[in-house]
Amino acid sequence: MANKPDHHHHHHQSSRRLMLVLYFTSVLGIGFIAAFLCLSSSIPSVSAVFSIWVPVNRPEIQIPIIDSKIVQKRSKQSNDTKDHVRFLSAIFADIPAPELKWEEMESAPVPRLDGYSVQINNLLYVFSGYGSLDYVHSHVDVFNFTDNKWCDRFHTPKEMANSHLGIVTDGRYVYVVSGQLGPQCRGPTSRSFVLDSFTKTWLEFPSLPAPRYAPATQIWRGRLHVMGGSKENRNAVAFDHWSIAVKDGKALDEWREEVPIPRGGPHRACVVANDKLLVIGGQEGDFMAKPNSPIFKCSRRREIFNGEVYMMDEEMKWKMLPPMPKNNSHIESAWIIVNNSIVIVGGTTDWHPVTKRLVLVGEIFRFQLDTLTWSVIGRLPYRVKTAMAGFWNGYLYFTSGQRDRGPDNPQPGKVIGEMWRTKLKF
């Protein structure tokens, strides 16, 4: 008879093997732990090593949800900024607009930034301005719309401002009020002058009560009105409003105070239309001279742009009208009046919130005076600020200013003297 298997003995041997395995595993584990503790006491901790590359408790940074390619160092901002940089919001976008056919004309004799102009009949008088930040012009160039040629040039008075002028014409006499004298961010002058455009002679005119940079300037109801601008340090906002009676290039009385403008600042369009005085766009604050700089080197300061429209009527009270489609500045000479509408070309708008760079404007805006409504009626060949506009025989002209760096980069680039025209149809 065969013997039965001894199950109890087999189970006892298996238990002993398991206990031996656990024993040796435990000994090895204790050895590894001891070695690790010994080693860790003589070298930096893991977290300390990693902190060289990843700071501990680093601050949380809020970044808009956009393509990382547009977050670039300002000092290395490339010229091929992607299209979507310009479409973070409506303010920074190129507003959709009809494409216009542009014809390039004869360029101005010199490039100009912050130049100023007036149109008298078929002649566009272009005044002074920067050739570069280190050089300013002291002359007037004249363009003849009939011949489409630059036809004349003459000097301005030595004491007259070179940029940031207040300027207006009555159809013969050109009133030039205050402004900046010299290059970079030099100080302002209150000296004012009158040009007789028929004889090309200059006349003295009473100085403004205080010097101003780029004040809004117009002739309304027989009085020369000067409003806002920047104060003596170039950055502080001025709200002053003065007027003086004028006729045939002469002052008939003295400067007097008027109702201050509700929102001050420089670089605005100032228009008289339908017996109303309008002030459009502009900004608060501007670049100012760097402290102790012997050349008054321009230093960036905070600028707040706006597209607000203020109107003064027969009651001598300011009223707000609908604002521009987007904030816009540097448009002092960038407007014309045609078909009961104000047309404004180009300008500069709010700083880009990511790159912190200036954004130029490339649209053409129309403000209909009968309906008080704004529209975008076209696009310029490129974005440009401080352009100077004229209108003749159905054509809208613009010349000079500072253009962008290309179709996909709205930052300010080259100072130009180019002139273009397009047929206006509306």
Swiss-Prot record:
Keywords: Kelch repeat, Membrane, Repeat, Transmembrane, Transmembrane helix. GO terms for cellular component: endosome; Golgi apparatus; Golgi medial cisterna; membrane; trans-Golgi network. The keyword Transmembrane applies. It comes from Arabidopsis thaliana (Mouse-ear cress). Kelch repeats lie at residues 123-170, 173-222, 224-275, 276-338, 341-394. The chain crosses the membrane at residues 18-38. It is a single-pass membrane protein. It is found in: Membrane. Coiled coil: none annotated. It comes from the Eukaryota. This is Kelch repeat-containing protein At3g27220. The keyword Lipid metabolism does not apply. GO terms for biological process: anaerobic respiration; cellular response to hypoxia.
